[in-house]
Amino acid sequence: MPAVYINRVATAVPPYDVHDAFRRFAQSTLHLANPRQARLFERMADKSGIEHRFSCLTPSNRPEGDHFDAGGFYARSDFPDTATRMEQYERHAPELAQAAVERLHLGADRDRITHLIVTSCTGFSAPGLDLDLIARCELPTTVERTVIGFMGCYAAINALKLAYHIVRSEASARVLLVNLELCTLHLKENADLEQMLSFLLFADGCAASLVSAEPSGIALDSFRAVLVPDTRDLITWNIRDAGFDMVLSGRVPAVIQDGLRRSADEILAGAPAASIDLWAVHPGGRTVLDAVERAFALAPTALATSRDVLRRYGNMSSATVMFVIERLMRSGARGRSGCAMSFGPGLIAETMLFRTAA
């Protein structure tokens, strides 16, 4: 069977940096209900490790006022229903996905794409984003399409796993992966501090990648899934009348740390963590990265790329780990071993061992 490679990755974000505006909107909302929680929110914001996040929504000049955004999508005390949120997804998702694919500069490879895999947990429609991309990017109409929906942050690793098996079974396959998330469409107005932390963390973004047997980029070696028992309620993502409801327990970092520590030999195929040169860890938040660092006893610099992506973009769900992989590939390291991982509902860690092409 052929070796399988991520040949290249490209990324795109919307034009609006909303981190400061979301922070001000959430802080003012909490202050009205509970000034003490508002002060705690500010301290947590200062320690989040995030400086920028991007959204398809245009922020208003005064997010402390009646509307967060210029279009009135988030009006104080009148947040949108699910149908309105999905209308915005249908409007903005195809354009952002196309931008990421175009940055791959496929050229002649465009006509050679055999498979298309799309991941998203932030919106749905039919005909969907897969067919939008075929039309917008002029892909072959015969392309085989798969949509991996509603898996959350670890969907990109599952998409890579699927592409890996496709190429191993069809050596001539050329698989286009698109990870598109518009997380900022699903914020909730709530006086609960834990719920309002989503205003500090989530963002919009898209990654596109090409996977094939061509020996360039990074080689995909193996995959492991680690399910932590009795953690089903710690991360949940449910469709409700007023949008998609997120539960993200404060226990998640500690559970991730314990689960990774117990499963380290399985994840790393018996290799010591010190032998892994490159770490592509989904930056689900600063405390999540801290938990991974402690679980594998990593050097403080080991997760520098993940921390930089968190600082520049926040958590873009399934797209985020691909932003990390793109930056590691761009660094030009060759012949080095790596480990990628993402976390999500279950609680599950989806992991992948890779190596840079010689």
Residue ranges and their predicted role:
Residues 83-88, 118, 145-149, 194-196, ...:
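A short glycine/serine-rich beta->alpha loop
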Residues 124-139, 177-188, 232-237, 289-303:
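Acidic-glycine-rich active-site phosphate/pyrophosphate-binding loop
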